[in-house]
Amino acid sequence: LQRYAADFARRYQSIPKYQVYNTALLSYFQGRGFKTEQLDPSRWGRWVESAIGAHLVNYTQEQDFDLYYWRDHNDEVDFVIRQTGNRLMALEVKSGHRQDNSGLHVFADKFHPEHSLVIGGDAFPTELFLSTPIERFLSL
């Protein structure tokens, strides 16, 4: 994924974020099972973020939106959806109870997305996000 920036040229000045298209392949090549991944909060967090990212990347093939990430120093947003007309939606993925969403607030101040959503943890359930057609979120 490319880094989101309002200026087109700046999007391609940053190092892209690696995103798998299929988390089954990620799990297979890491040689760990689902239950083993869940036992390590750090690894589980990366796995959940990868699952959400794969879900979104696969939808970019069907829907009219572009997918990015955003980072500015220590502030980060896991996924930024840009729809037609530069409508933005910011998504932050949480796999545990740690709810530091400061990156969402900084991003909102800079870019004014129409919507922001925290997925997982004590927020919007991960399973519900993955089982809901992405069009529902894009039409909010």
Regions inferred by a protein language model and the residue ranges of each:
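Hydrophobic/aromatic beta-strand patches that form the interior of the parallel beta-sheet core
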Residues: Q19, Y68, M89-L91, H115-I119
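Active-site ExK catalytic segment of metal-dependent nucleases
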Residues: R87-H97
